[in-house]
Amino acid sequence: DYKGKLLVINFWYINFGPCIAEMPYLNDLVNQYQNEDIHFLALSFDTITDIKSFLNKTEFKYEHGSISRSLMYDFTPVAPGHFIVDSDGIIRDIIVGAPRQTELIFDKLVDLIEKNKK
């Protein structure tokens, strides 16, 4: 239950290099905010079985869920996508696509999280 909490959502899928490339930086983000009331959710259109198999081999510290491809593309036409949802459930910021320098995603998300913390 994420009601009343800041939520960072990542839309991704297993077979897309830019999604995989940013995972170490997203893990760093989770580590940085581990003592704060901020939640991290990764949503993929891959099956639960495929996600679990992938996570057995690759560390990705977000909580995980599976959604339909059409629902994912209703939110973001390009992966990866990142949404910052405030404690009132309002989408406050969106990053669509991966930066050319993947490590920049960490700084961009930190800036948005800090801006939206209450």
Annotate each language-model stretch with its function:
Residues Y13-G17, F45-T49, I91, A98-P99:
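Solvent-exposed loop/turn segments at secondary-structure junctions
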Residues I20-E59, S66-Y73:
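Structural microenvironment flanking redox-active thiols in thiol-disulfide oxidoreductases
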Residues S53-F60, S66-L112:
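Thiol/disulfide oxidoreductase modules built on the thioredoxin-like
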Residues D1-L7, Y33:
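A short beta-strand-turn-helix
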Residues V8-I9, F40, H82:
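Hydrophobic beta-strand anchors of alpha/beta hydrolase catalytic cores
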Residues K115-K118:
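Non-globular targeting/processing and membrane-anchoring segments
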Residues K3, F11-D28:
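Conserved redox-active cysteine motifs that mediate thiol-disulfide chemistry
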